[in-house]
Regions:
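Extracytoplasmic/secreted envelope proteins and their assembly/folding machinery
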Residues: 4, 58, 83, 87-90, ...
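Juxtacatalytic substrate-recognition/specificity segment
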Residues: 1-78
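Amphipathic alpha-helical substructures
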Residues: 103, 124, 131-139, 143-188
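Long, well-ordered core segments of solenoidal/helical folds
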Residues: 61-62, 66, 108-121, 163-171
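Sec-exported extracytoplasmic/periplasmic mature domains
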Residues: 5-12, 66, 70, 90-98, ...
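Post-HExxH zinc-binding segment in Zn-dependent metallohydrolases
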Residues: 43-45, 76-121
Length: 188
């Protein structure tokens, strides 16, 4: 509930909708998001893996906005944005929602730096080859934007304001965004 509360607050979301979470009892790793649901396979939660469990839940839930509603006009060149920005928001809400301590957030940023160093192409040319470098490099771009937005507005706006602007300029996701929409939402 804290994850959902933190993400809906970030998005300024007040609508009440049905969203299903499917947790099959399969010892595997990963999740897949759909418009009104996601499935998540992971080993049973323990104290040791609780931050990883919570992060994947937060990541897949945020795809409700940044994938199911907000979609790029070109799928392949926007994967870094959809996955990386979603990963950053997941990391952020663990801290802001008091699901995990700030040290977990800082650890995630450190791991993103390590993973992003393995990137062998530009983000927009990575295509559909998902993996840690894509998620992490995109998350670092999101982190940079969040810091820049907060600094430019003396803390009055953040990455959530950017996403709310992007929803607005795409008519709540009815229209797929172009890079000009991203720029417009960032500068609004």
């Amino acid at each position: 509930t804290r994850i959902i509360a933190a993400e809906t607050a970030l998005m300024g979301w007040t609508r009440r909708e049905v969203y299903n979470v499917v947790l099959p009892p399969v010892a595997d790793t990963g999740g897949e998001a759909y418009r009104q649901s996601f499935a998540y396979c992971f080993t049973d939660p323990t104290v040791a893996n609780a931050p990883a469990w919570a992060n994947t839940l937060a990541h897949e839930i945020f795809h409700y906005w940044n994938y199911a509603r907000l979609k790029g006009a070109d799928y392949a060149s926007t994967q870094w944005f959809q996955e990386g920005f979603t990963e950053y928001v997941a990391n952020l809400v663990l801290m802001t929602g008091k699901v995990a301590p700030p040290s977990v957030f800082l650890g995630k940023l450190s791991k993103h730096i390590e993973n992003a160093a393995k990137l062998t192409t530009t983000l927009e040319n990575i295509g559909t080859r998902k993996g840690p470098p894509l998620y992490s490099a995109g998350a670092l771009v999101a982190f940079s934007w969040d810091v820049a937005i907060r600094r430019a507005t003396a803390g009055r706006r953040d990455i959530g304001a950017f996403f709310r602007n992007l929803l607005r300029v795409t008519s709540d996701g009815a229209r797929r965004y172009a890079w000009s929409d991203i720029r417009g939402a960032l500068e609004a």
